[in-house]
């Protein structure tokens, strides 16, 4: 399952050096806001793991950046 498919209606957990644990839900945030938030975190210098809670998708920073840019 692609990250863009997970974002729609799913909960995506973003762990940034185990310091941040953001839960982004489609029902509480506009899809554009989710994309912008992901872009800001992905562009940061810290290592990042994107993981979808429902399908256990883990994706690397570079791949995630490509997919998010494509989604926008």
Language-model regions, residue ranges each:
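Absolute protein N-terminus
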Residues: 1-2
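A generic structural motif
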Residues: 7, 18, 42-45
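A structural micro-motif recognizing beta-strand termini
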Residues: 17-19, 29-31
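Short alpha-helix capping/helix-loop boundary micro-motifs
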Residues: 23-27
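C-terminal structural segments of small proteins and small subunits
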Residues: 42, 46-72
């Amino acid at each position: 399952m692609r990250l863009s498919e997970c974002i729609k209606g799913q909960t995506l957990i973003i762990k940034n050096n185990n310091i941040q644990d953001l839960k982004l839900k489609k029902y509480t945030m506009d899809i554009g806001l989710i994309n912008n938030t992901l872009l800001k975190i992905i562009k940061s210098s810290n290592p990042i793991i994107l993981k979808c809670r429902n399908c256990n998708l883990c994706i690397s920073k570079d791949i995630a950046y490509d997919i998010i840019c494509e989604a926008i």
